[in-house]
């Protein structure tokens, strides 16, 4: 696969995730030292599902993130472009509707969802701005966007230590827990190429979201961005 900062072909990324689907959640918990579960809880708080709402969870993978949104009266749609991930998700969580979807061309109607969320998937999209525009399109007026993504640690010393872990230790450790360690080499590359917190916030605003903000998690290893689709003009 070409380096993440040069190209992100959808078919290549999908095939890579097909290969790791079976053990993906366990590997993530191990390689993040349990932080992945904490981040999912923080995303659930940001989404704050309410009865009567319909929530779209993009890049949902096996549905590990989607389960937290299952509240009485809440409809959850889990979408992903990896058939391997979707197969695992349908097997593990039959109570959730799983849909094959490309984030840059969503198979949903305009203004269909109260909340759209995507966790650790926006980096893998070929056209980030187009994907954010599609999310805006399918949101209802006043609807909420929640993006959870790897980010940049503000502290330079800690950031350098984290980069060393990503580039030198993560690939070696992943080889012990995954049959496709190249997926985690791609992870390190894509994190390194990803815009910092403020840059992503500006892009979200550029697309047309209002009241955009972000909160760092775990020293800034991850950031949760939020924004809202404008209400229709009277």
Predicted region positions:
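A short acidic, Gly/Pro-enriched loop at the edge of an enzyme's catalytic core
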Residues: 104-116
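A short glycine-rich, Lys/Arg-flanked "PGG" loop and its adjoining helix->strand segment in the class I
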Residues: 129-141
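A short SAM/SAH-binding and catalytic strip from SAM-dependent methyltransferases
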Residues: 114-128, 151
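N-terminal, positively charged/glycine-rich alpha-helical extensions of SAM-dependent methyltransferases
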Residues: 1-23, 177
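C-terminal alpha-helical "lid/dimerization" subdomain adjacent to the S-adenosyl-L-methionine
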Residues: 11, 148-203, 207, 213
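Conserved alpha-helix/loop element of class I SAM-dependent methyltransferases that forms part
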Residues: 33-53
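Core SAM-dependent methyltransferase catalytic element
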Residues: 201, 207-234
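Class I SAM-dependent methyltransferase SAM/SAH-binding core
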Residues: 54-105
């Amino acid at each position: 696969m070409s380096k993440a900062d040069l190209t992100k072909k959808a078919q290549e990324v999908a095939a890579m995730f097909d290969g790791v689907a079976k053990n993906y959640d366990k590997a993530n918990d191990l390689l993040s030292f349990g932080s992945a579960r904490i981040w999912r809880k923080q995303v659930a708080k940001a989404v704050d599902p309410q009865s009567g709402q319909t929530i779209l969870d993009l890049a949902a993978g096996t549905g590990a993130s989607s389960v937290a949104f299952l509240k009485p009266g809440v409809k959850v749609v889990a979408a992903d472009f990896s058939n391997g991930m979707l197969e695992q998700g349908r097997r593990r969580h039959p109570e959730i509707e799983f849909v094959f979807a490309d984030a840059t061309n969503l198979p949903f109607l305009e203004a269909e969802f109260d909340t759209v969320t995507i966790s650790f998937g926006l980096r893998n999209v070929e056209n980030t701005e187009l994907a954010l525009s599609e999310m805006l399109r399918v949101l209802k007026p006043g609807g909420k966007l929640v993006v959870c993504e790897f980010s940049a640690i503000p502290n330079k010393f800690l950031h350098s230590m984290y980069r060393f872990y990503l580039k030198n230790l993560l690939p070696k450790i992943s080889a012990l827990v995954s049959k496709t360690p190249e997926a985690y080499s791609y992870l390190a590359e894509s994190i390194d190429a990803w815009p910092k917190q403020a840059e992503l916030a500006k892009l979200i605003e550029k697309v047309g979201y209002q009241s955009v903000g972000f909160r760092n998690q775990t020293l800034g290893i991850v950031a949760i961005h939020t924004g809202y689709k404008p209400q229709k003009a009277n």
